[in-house]
Amino acid sequence: MTHHIYNIYKQAAIALTLLLSATAIKAQTPTRWNNESADTTRITSLLTQVASQGNLTANQRISTFAHLLEDTPYVAGTLEQTPEILTVNLDGMDCTTFVETVTALAMTLEEHRSAWQDFVYNLGQIRYRQGRADGYASRLHYVSDWIVDNTHRGLLTEVTDRLPGWSHQVKTLDYMSRHRSAYPALADDESFEKIKSVEVGFRSHRYPMLKSTLMQTKKGEALIKEGDILAFTTKTDGLDVSHIGIATIHPDGRPHLIHASSTAGKVIDDPLPLAEYLRKNHSITGVRVIRLGNLR
């Protein structure tokens, strides 16, 4: 009887600790909402829905969340507001905010948490350098920077160079500073100089890739798993990655892409197999594969 009462008190204490933790997280994370009431309700619903499916892998969770967000309208520039604080918008996404959102949702369940405040915290963790929003340049704009920073902190792992047939590309990442007028935030001299400082770390940056030609073969297709984060390398000078999405394997065994498509105007499970998608997009040079968690 005494042991039973002790367990009840212990469980209550754990629940209280988690509640206080979530409350503290909310207080510590300045957040800009598109629709706070609707978004927090939907985040809670998404987390509860996927948590109820049991012991899924991280990749399965990412895939499930990605499918649940299909038909979300494509909206560019949702983060381009001042001051730079964490922005949450489930009503409209571009390719980057879509991937960040599903990754943060899956990350929250991987931590055995299910509160919307925990999702908000995790979204900030993966979007910003060292998890802290501190001006425009603290956002991880270049996907290579996003991968390096999140890998260093054990949140993501790039597995591209562990897959058979991988190659590499060497590029100097300076697209943003060379196209300053395309980024309104860079009209501010301090932000511009900070972005240039970030780019200094990516001069002659070497990164792994699976060549587009390889990924158009059955051998290449077989390398992709359900829920992989796929980043598409580009021919564009000064830029590493031009698009990003989530892999899903169709019943015929072929990988497709769930992504926020500007062409379709919404998040879609692309009807084209990945190989055909690559064949049609001549500016894509290859694919990088990233997975959630520290997989070293």
PLM regions with names:
Residues T2-A13:
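Bacterial N-terminal signal peptides that target proteins for export
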Residues L223-I224:
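Short, well-ordered loop/turn sites that connect or cap secondary structure elements
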Residues T29-E100:
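Cationic-aromatic interfacial patches
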